[in-house]
Design a protein with these regions (language model features):
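Internal, well-ordered domain-core segments that constitute the primary functional module
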Residues: 240-257
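Small/polar beta-strand repeat architecture
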Residues: 37-64, 70-240
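Beta-propeller domains
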Residues: 15-40
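Short beta-strand elements that form the blades of beta-propeller/WD-repeat-like
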Residues: 12-19, 248-253
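Repeated scaffold domains used in trafficking and secretory/extracellular systems
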Residues: 2-9, 236-242
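Hydrophobic/aromatic beta-strand positions that recur at structurally equivalent sites within the blades
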Residues: 7, 27-29, 93
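Loop/turn residues immediately N-terminal
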Residues: 21-25, 88, 256-257
């Protein structure tokens, strides 16, 4: 928690502002309400989705950390896949191989899989020109239609946290159902969500620890080459909140927000 601020309404209701590096919340009794400001709401059709699925080009054992695909085209640079009942996280893509696999993720059991077994991917690529998001930001989608398979409209039209940034125009999320269970795209998920998708981006998240503005080792792990320098901007500063009340109204502001 980065900031706590208590105040009382004119009717005597007691509130507590709870500001973290990710969210702005109000606590009333046992009820926590998300009041994080919206930074940007897109026009309909600005946001598109892409899901991927493929097959194994050869069999793998329960300990293999390289997953060979028939084709890796369109697979995110890192992500989460499912083969049979096993969930696997992978760290990178090389040729048609998923590299650095962590087997038996999400409490599943690592297993042997055969050539041509389906490889389903939960990591969706989102395209939105000049989205302005940073890693760990939150965005709520609405107006999306099914991609055609497991990635239904219900899966898409909810709040998501940005998993990884690809560039200024795209990023990835991990598909889930409304109970936060991972959902994996299948071969029928070939759509893009339709022309009515709207993305409501919340205020950029901040850092939870202080780092110097320039130097080495201050970026996200794995974000650049070893020993490369980086710098901070207003979108990745230490999150500091200012909060006060005007009567019963809460006034708040995030550093750099």
């Amino acid at each position: 928690c980065r900031k706590l601020f208590p105040w009382i309404s004119l009717e005597g209701a007691k509130y507590l502002f709870v500001g973290t590096h990710l969210k702005a919340n109000i606590l009333e009794g046992n009820n926590l309400a998300d009041i994080t400001p919206i930074r940007l709401t897109t026009s309909a059709g600005d946001v598109t989705f892409a899901g991927k699925a493929n097959t194994l080009s050869s069999g793998i054992t329960a300990t293999d950390t390289t997953i060979p695909l028939t084709s890796s085209t369109g697979f995110p640079a890192s992500g989460t896949i499912q083969i049979g009942s096993e969930t696997i996280n992978y760290a990178s893509v090389s040729g048609n191989n998923l590299i650095g696999a962590t087997r038996g993720a999400e409490s599943t059991t690592a297993a042997t899989h055969s050539s041509s077994d389906a490889v389903l991917c939960a990591t969706l690529t989102i395209t939105d020109t000049s989205h302005g998001a940073v890693q760990n930001d939150f965005v709520t989608f609405s107006g999306a239609s099914s991609l055609g398979g497991n990635i239904t409209a219900t899966v898409l039209n909810q709040e998501y946290q940005v998993a990884n940034l690809i560039n200024a125009n795209s990023y990835t999320i991990k598909a889930k159902d409304t109970s936060n269970n991972t959902v994996f795209a299948n071969s029928s998920d070939s759509g893009n969500g339709g022309s009515s998708v709207v993305g409501a981006y919340q205020l950029n998240t901040g850092l939870d620890v202080f780092v110097q503005a320039d130097g080495w080792g201050v970026g996200t792990w794995g974000a650049g080459g070893f020993g490369s320098s980086t710098s901070l901007s207003f979108t990745n500063q230490l999150r500091l909140w200012s909060a006060d009340n005007f009567g019963e109204d809460l006034i708040l502001h995030a550093r750099g927000g």
